[in-house]
Amino acid sequence: MRLYALLPCFIFAAACAETTHYEWAVPVKAEANLYRVDDKLYRSEQPVRDDAALIKKLGIKTVINLRYFDRRGDEKALAGSGIALFNQPLLTWRIRPKDIAATLYLIERQQQYGAVLVHCYHGADRTGLMVAMYRIVYQHWPVAEAKREMLQGPYGYHSIWVNLERLFSAEDIAQIRERLSQLRGDKNKLSPPYSRGREIF
């Protein structure tokens, strides 16, 4: 009898374990593909001048541009905002674990000054990859859940980039963590592949 009495508890616990909910980024401005990942990280497509007031209102202190081509969009959109602007150029078809680690470390460093916005052109692929890795490394999401948000979230991921999906292997994630540890060990030196942020007033 005692076993039957406990059975509903086991079933309930198992159901809860299977339905653990990992909350995707919260929409802020849909037409800018702007979402809040957490208190210190936002994601979007390439900002335009009309986005500047909102970005500042959100308390964003740093904007990191992942675009490889046409890198001056942030200067045009955010001139006079006082926001620190960084270029961290990535070619979508040639992103390596060390590039991911470098970008995550830049986000980590800049978050000590306030919220960070990371973007590429569409805010879907390179940005989606970085947010997924941020989920794994800093928020301790299961790899499958972080990858699912990147692929299935409302951000417009382009399935052509199968190489990005392959970066979720255990080996690549271990390399990312190892490289991050190395970068933290040399935290007082800002060296390539970083570019120093420009504050534009």
Regions found by a protein language model. Give the residues of each.
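Conserved lysine of the Walker
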Residues: 126
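Bacterial N-terminal signal peptides
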Residues: 4-13
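Short cysteine clusters
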Residues: 120
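Cys-dependent protein tyrosine phosphatase-like superfamily
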Residues: 16-116, 129-201
